[in-house]
Amino acid sequence: LGIRVTDKRQAPPRLHDLPSLQKLCASRFGWPAAKTLEVAQALYDGEGKKIITYPRAEVRYLPENLASDVPRIVAGLQVGQSFKSIPVPSSPVIRKGSRGSFHDKGLEGASHHAVIPNVNTIDILREVWPRLSIDEKKLFDVIARGYLAAVMPDFRYRQTIATLDASGFVFKATGRQPIDPGWRAAFPKWRPDEKGDDAQWLPTMKSGETTQLLNPTIEDKETRPPLRYNEGTLIEAMQNAWRFVDDESLRDRLKEAKGIGTPATRAEIIVGLKRQGFLAIQAKNVVPTETGLALYGVLRTADPALVDPGVTAQLECLLDDVVVGKQDMVGAID
């Protein structure tokens, strides 16, 4: 065996905005995008609730001055049994800047910050909790754990790359051994999406060791087409319309654009397309109907720009420039 070992660390995931909540709830709970918004709205302004901040956010940062609320929110959450065992340090980790959670510049042009527990009602969470529905508890759990993870230490792990020469054929395995769970301790039952060999756990190995192959097999495999959209991943695609732009210079420019629709309208756009018979749900996947494909063909023939998501992204980017003063209204119209 040839072994290369490197100690690494991983910062916590970003806080949630509405699109990330819709994507997560679609994959974990099977919720339509509209349901996630409905449940979030109830947690925000439902009678006797009001335990999260404005849910229709499309940014995953907080203002830097909200760092002072961290101790109070953490203490309020840990009163309840659901979050009591999460080992948030007595001095929470405040990460600022683009790689952290508190980033003023990341909020430029945004009306609302990331979705987090409401500091103004955190002290009465124990009283409110019994009144919540099962779905409301599920969604609040997602939001609360995301917030707690954001102020916990990095996940530290040892990355091992093992190479094995077997009769002239070199095999490689990459994996991890945990050193300190850090923020991952906030998620005992699930993990953020991870794919590939880097995510697997390997036992302790030493360079120079000899090993024995047990029941080796050769498998024939084929590449698979991209997965179909569910409502959560479709919301994400609508938010990141820049990915559908071929021009590399435009792609970078459009990454900060709002994409197709807004957090408040994307779920309703999907609902409307289903209601009109252009989209349907098959085994939790969103698929175009024959009517939808026929309409797409007509519009694309008439003018490809009508069905180009990149064009919409460019228009949204132009409107954003008007909002922040980078472009005047007359120039934008022209």
Predicted regions: what they are:
Residues 1-334:
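Core catalytic DNA strand-manipulation module of type IA topoisomerases
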